[in-house]
Amino acid sequence: MNSTESYFGTDDYDNTEYYSIPPDHGPCSLEEVRNFTKVFVPIAYSLICVFGLLGNIMVVMTFAFYKKARSMTDVYLLNMAITDILFVLTLPFWAVTHATNTWVFSDALCKLMKGTYAVNFNCGMLLLACISMDRYIAIVQATKSFRVRSRTLTHSKVICVAVWFISIIISSPTFIFNKKYELQDRDVCEPRYRSVSEPITWKLLGMGLELFFGFFTPLLFMVFCYLFIIKTLVQAQNSKRHRAIRVVIAVVLVFLACQIPHNMVLLVTAVNTGKVGRSCSTEKVLAYTRNVAEVLAFLHCCLNPVLYAFIGQKFRNYFMKIMKDVWCMRRKNKMPGFLCARVYSESYISRQTSETVENDNASSFTM
């Protein structure tokens, strides 16, 4: 079997996965690609993991200690932060795998990491669609917003549970088929389709579900909702409308910049699954593109807290309170007593006052 057949065919080692490390098959040597990924991918994943954890933990801390989730957007933001945290926690395992060019962990951890990786990636994308619709209701349907959002808020947790359930269902092939096995004297954690009669069909099904729910669904929601939001803001006589429009445009552009390359590579891979006859140079270009595109896609974990939470004035205020309290805790070790009690007291009073005057249906996100 030549390199193209192995790369896009029905070989046990399924390199159609966008996060795979391309092995060296036949006359087409991808050693230079592996040398690139050994350095680039671990560094990129480590940075995404660190900054993604910091930003999303701040969001969770804000809801846990300073601000109750009172609106639909709050519930979505909290779930998205949890999703991103779980997602970035899988990246160190893949960083080690790329650096060592082998899977050094157990078979159970292989299934768990691949499954967690897929579930949280898809869940995060679906939550972006939910946030888009919530903003559409709040801004475009402003006259009906209070009634609609109040009624729907009761079911917001149910909506999030449904999103998690759908994400688990569409990611189930990842849990089922991924396993640890030996290939060319090294252990890999990849899908293996020996147990099914139509392996290419299962590959295409998995990629199709990811493309539909992980890209096209949130894209359609965002395009529809944000076009009407921009139209409404342009017509509004509001001094802050220009800033709001810039925020909307930034959200859409960041989503497109992060997700289009990754999903185009996935689409090309799906179209060419089972085909033969591609040149070695084409394989190398696709391998490079796949690794760079996935890093771009994963940047959303770092950018989501900024674009969807801390861009709002209220969240920035809570962020400053967190910083003050962290500073206070450090000072407490040196100067125990009134200083920390004073800061915590002011924070507590401020929180109570804010929650008293704030409408129960108000969102912590303000554009």
Curated annotation (Swiss-Prot):
Residues 1-39, 97-111, 173-203, 272-295 are extracellular. Its main location: membrane. GO terms for biological process: calcium-mediated signaling; cell chemotaxis; chemotaxis; DN2 thymocyte differentiation; DN3 thymocyte differentiation; isotype switching to IgA isotypes; leukocyte migration involved in inflammatory response; lymphocyte migration. GO terms for molecular function: C-C chemokine binding; C-C chemokine receptor activity. Gene3D superfamilies: Rhodopsin 7-helix transmembrane proteins. InterPro entries: CCR1-9-like, Chemokine_CCR6, Chemokine_rcpt, GPCR_Rhodpsn, GPCR_Rhodpsn_7TM. Disulfide bonds join 110-189. Belongs to the G-protein coupled receptor 1 family. Glycans are attached at residues 2, 35. Induction: Up-regulated on pre-germinal center B-cells in a CD40-dependent manner. Up-regulated and down-regulated in Th17 cells by TGFB1 and IL2 respectively. It is found in: Cell membrane; Cell surface. The keyword Transmembrane helix applies. Receptor for the C-C type chemokine CCL20. Binds to CCL20 and subsequently transduces a signal by increasing the intracellular calcium ion levels. Although CCL20 is its major ligand it can also act as a receptor for non-chemokine ligands such as beta-defensins. Binds to defensin DEFB1 leading to increase in intracellular calcium ions and cAMP levels. Its binding to DEFB1 is essential for the function of DEFB1 in regulating sperm motility and bactericidal activity. Binds to defensins DEFB4 and DEFB4A/B and mediates their chemotactic effects. Residues 67-75, 134-151, 231-246, 314-367 are cytoplasmic. Keywords: Cell membrane, Disulfide bond, G-protein coupled receptor, Glycoprotein, Membrane, Receptor, Transducer, Transmembrane, Transmembrane helix. Sperm. Mainly localized in the principal piece and neck region of the tail but is also found in the acrosomal region in a small percentage of sperm cells. Expressed in natural regulatory T cells (nTregs) and a subset of early thymocyte progenitor double-negative 1 (DN1) cells. Expressed in memory B cells. Expressed by IL17 producing helper T-cells (Th17), type 1 effector cells (Th1), type 2 effector cells (Th2) and regulatory T-cells (Treg) (at protein level). Expressed by Th17 cells in spleen, Peyers patches, and lamina propria of small and large intestine. This is C-C chemokine receptor type 6. It comes from Mus musculus. PANTHER family: C-C CHEMOKINE RECEPTOR TYPE 6, CELL ADHESION MOLECULE. It is a multi-pass membrane protein. One of its GO terms (cellular component) is sperm flagellum. The keyword Protein biosynthesis does not apply. Pfam families: 7tm_1 (PF00001). The chain crosses the membrane at residues 40-66, 76-96, 112-133, 152-172, 204-230, 247-271, 296-313.
